[in-house]
Amino acid sequence: MRSLLLTVLLNLVVLLATTGAVSSNLNTAVNYASTSKIRFLSTEYNADEKRSLRGDYNNEVTKEPNTSDEERAFSISKSAEYVKMVLYGFKLGFSPRTQSKTVLRYEDKLFTALYKSGETPRSLRTKHLDKASASVFFNRFKKWYDKNVGPS
């Protein structure tokens, strides 16, 4: 019972302490409500300004955030792209003569990921010499590597 009373009192205090609240006496408050502006608690929390989650625009020292230099969290779209790249790798191993635009796009992403992980055509060939369909994959990776990175 005591917690219910405290909850009701807390809600009452919060409602009455709202900034810019006008009293319920309309006869005397009409002039006040029509001539005065709403006062905010602080100029930092002004409702007229744009809100930003990346920085404080009230501070003149703050520069525009550079969103390209930060690493994004692991998301569903990233994981879906990763699964598509892996599936494309399997598809390329089984049917190496596919040349559609989506296949070439995922091939480029797959080869870029391989290059960023430090793989070269020689290192891949030495790791996977025993696979029968590996030669087509390595030839395509070598062509991509020579075109984008330089001769190996």
From Swiss-Prot:
Conditions for induction: Expression is induced during host plant infection.
Family membership: Belongs to the RxLR effector family.
Gene Ontology CC annotations of this record: extracellular region; host cell nucleolus; host cell plasma membrane; membrane
Residues covered by region (W motif): 99-152
Record protein name field: RxLR effector protein Avrblb1
Span of the signal peptide: 1-24
Lineage, highest ranks first: Eukaryota, Sar, Stramenopiles, Oomycota, Peronosporales
Keyword Repeat in record: no
Function summary: Secreted effector that acts as an elicitor of hypersensitive response (HR) specifically on plants carrying defense protein RGA2/Rpi-blb1. Enhances P.infestans colonization of plant hosts Nicotiana benthamiana and potato Solanum bulbocastanum leaves. Associates with host legume-type lectin receptor kinases and disrupts attachments between the host plasma membrane and cell wall.
Subcellular location: Secreted; Host nucleus, Host nucleolus; Host nucleus; Host cell membrane
Residues with glycosylation annotation: N66
Motif (RxLR-dEER): 51-72
Residue span of motif RGD RLK-binding motif: 54-56
UniProt entry keywords in alphabetical sequence: Glycoprotein, Host cell membrane, Host membrane, Host nucleus, Membrane, Secreted, Signal, Virulence
Gene responsible for this protein: Avrblb1
Entry's free-text remark on domains: The RxLR-dEER motif acts to carry the protein into the host cell cytoplasm through binding to cell surface phosphatidylinositol-3-phosphate.
Subunit structure: Interacts with host defense protein RGA2/Rpi-blb1. Interacts with host legume-type lectin receptor kinase LECRK19.
